[in-house]
Amino acid sequence: DLWELAKMILKETGKNPLPSYGAYGCYCGWGG
């Protein structure tokens, strides 16, 4: 799904692919 794709992009690029979802990303744990 989109979230899995976003995590893959983050892993590959080291960048958050969804900057507009920064707060949501923090909630879900971009760092693992």
Swiss-Prot record:
Positions that bind Ca(2+): Y27, G29, G31
Any one GO BP annotation for this protein: phospholipid metabolic process
A GO MF term: toxin activity
Domain of life: Eukaryota
Cofactor remark from the record: Binds 1 Ca(2+) ion.
Subcellular localization: Secreted
Pfam families linked: Phospholip_A2_1 (PF00068)
GO cellular component assignments: extracellular region
Reactions catalysed, as given in the entry: a 1,2-diacyl-sn-glycero-3-phosphocholine + H2O = a 1-acyl-sn-glycero-3-phosphocholine + a fatty acid + H(+)
Tissue/organ expression: Expressed by the venom gland.
Keywords in alphabetical order: Calcium, Disulfide bond, Hydrolase, Lipid degradation, Lipid metabolism, Metal-binding, Myotoxin, Secreted, Toxin
EC numbers for this chain: 3.1.1.4
UniProt entry tagged with the keyword NAD: no
Any further remark recorded for this protein: Does not induce platelet aggregation and does not inhibit collagen or ADP-induced platelet aggregation.
Subunit (UniProt): Monomer.
Family the entry assigns: Belongs to the phospholipase A2 family. Group II subfamily. K49 sub-subfamily.
Function, as annotated: Snake venom phospholipase A2 that shows high myotoxic activity, slight neutrophil activation (demonstrated by activation induction of IL-1beta production), slight cytotoxicity against Jurkat (leukemia T) and SK-BR-3 (breast adenocarcinoma) tumor cell lines, and slight antiparasitic activity against promastigote forms of Leishmania amazonensis. PLA2 catalyzes the calcium-dependent hydrolysis of the 2-acyl groups in 3-sn-phosphoglycerides.
Protein name: Basic phospholipase A2 BmatTX-III
Natural source organism: Bothrops mattogrossensis (Pitviper)
